């Protein structure tokens, strides 16, 4: 029940408090060079891409948010239905509660709403140090008919959480066991503090093929935990890390330096389809957002669909104004960083 209460707290805090990182994602330092004569019909702009052997209508992921509570069930169902209509991907929130509270399964079960989407199951990697087995990870995947499993890395959040899991020793070999055991790919994802080149290489070396950089610039989970603190000392400790992390743009560059061959998801502080286009240009295969979708999904499916359409139109207009008919063209679009052409 403690896990369920924590999830309730997380939803409420994210919706009602300012929990943004004190750092920027870095994308404001990158600008596309405007193409005044693109020689393209807007109707021919093609945002489709392939991810996990499925076609996405746009390279967008609704990043992992929640699960385990009635409110989370409604949010996930609305997100999934809107993702199905738009043809984009979706990640589920941490599914640890499902292993201890089987009755929470319906808060994660969205395939009826979204039979065709790329769907990602999710659990904290550190749980492998607390008894979660590869077999249980496969159960999480099977229970929601997921296309992959996210193992998220949230060390700073755990260390600033009153009930956090603090033993991260010898975790990499256990992650490797899961990578080798599962019938679907494992995605390694940070939660808002970024992946370095060194860390990315550690995962690539054990066979991980997909990394989500989830850099700083958006939600700071240390700030979320500051609001959950049960005393002033805990609050002060968590609050002091407001400027911690690797900005998303920097993390994206680092991960791409580690490998040109893996799939990379850019998330963390992206605010629009314009930011998403910049992420694609800088090396991401798809990009993820959470905050804008959470607020919409707490209200209605229609608002989620409107938010998705906004991001897609921003992406398409950016593609048009850079002369990029396809996502592959966008990856080569002309950029300026700090007023210096790239």
UniProtKB/Swiss-Prot annotation:
UniProt keyword Cytoplasm, yes or no: yes
GO BP of this protein: isoprenoid biosynthetic process
EC number of this enzyme: 5.3.3.2
Binding site for substrate: 6-7, 94-96, 157
Keyword Nucleotide-binding in record: no
Required cofactor(s): FMN; NADPH; Mg(2+)
GO cellular component terms given for this protein: cytoplasm
MF terms in GO: FMN binding; isopentenyl-diphosphate delta-isomerase activity; magnesium ion binding; NADPH binding; oxidoreductase activity
InterPro entries: Aldolase_TIM, FMN-dep_DH, IPdP_isomerase
Primary site of residence: cytoplasm
NCBIfam families named in the record: IPP_isom_2
Family: Belongs to the IPP isomerase type 2 family.
PANTHER family on file: ISOPENTENYL-DIPHOSPHATE DELTA-ISOMERASE
Function: Involved in the biosynthesis of isoprenoids. Catalyzes the 1,3-allylic rearrangement of the homoallylic substrate isopentenyl (IPP) to its allylic isomer, dimethylallyl diphosphate (DMAPP).
Protein's UniProt name: Isopentenyl-diphosphate delta-isomerase
Record organism: Rickettsia bellii (strain RML369-C)
Gene label: fni
């Amino acid at each position: 029940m403690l896990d369920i209460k924590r999830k309730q707290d997380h939803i409420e805090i994210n919706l009602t408090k300012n929990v943004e990182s004190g750092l920027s994602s870095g994308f404001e330092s990158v600008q596309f060079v405007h193409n005044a004569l693109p020689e393209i019909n807007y109707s021919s702009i093609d945002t489709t891409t392939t991810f996990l052997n499925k076609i996405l209508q746009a390279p967008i992921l609704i990043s992992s948010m929640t699960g385990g509570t009635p409110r989370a069930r409604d949010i996930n169902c609305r997100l999934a239905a809107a993702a199905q209509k738009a043809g984009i991907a979706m990640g589920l929130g941490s599914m640890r509660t499902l292993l201890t509270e089987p009755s929470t399964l319906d808060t994660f079960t969205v395939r009826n709403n979204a039979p065709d989407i790329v769907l990602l199951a999710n659990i904290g990697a550190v749980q492998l140090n607390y008894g979660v087995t590869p077999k249980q990870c496969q159960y999480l995947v099977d229970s929601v008919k997921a296309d992959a499993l996210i193992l998220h890395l949230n060390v700073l959040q755990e260390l600033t959480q009153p009930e956090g899991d603090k033993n991260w020793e010898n975790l990499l070999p256990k992650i490797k066991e899961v990578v080798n055991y599962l019938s679907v790919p494992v995605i390694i994802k940070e939660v808002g503090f970024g992946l370095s080149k060194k860390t990315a290489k550690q995962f690539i070396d054990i066979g991980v093929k997909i990394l989500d950089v989830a850099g700083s610039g958006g939600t700071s989970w240390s700030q979320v935990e500051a609001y959950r603190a049960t005393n002033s000392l805990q609050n002060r400790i968590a609050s002091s890390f407001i400027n911690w992390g690797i900005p998303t743009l920097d993390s994206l560059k680092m991960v791409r330096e580690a490998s040109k061959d893996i799939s990379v998801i850019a998330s963390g502080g992206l605010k629009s389809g314009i930011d998403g286009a910049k992420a694609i240009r800088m090396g991401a295969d798809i990009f993820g957002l959470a905050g804008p979708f959470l607020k919409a999904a707490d209200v209605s499916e229609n608002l989620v669909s409107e938010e998705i359409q906004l991001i897609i139109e921003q992406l398409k207009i950016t593609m048009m104004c850079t002369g990029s008919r396809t996502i592959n063209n966008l990856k080569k679009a002309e950029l300026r960083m700090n007023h210096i052409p790239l």
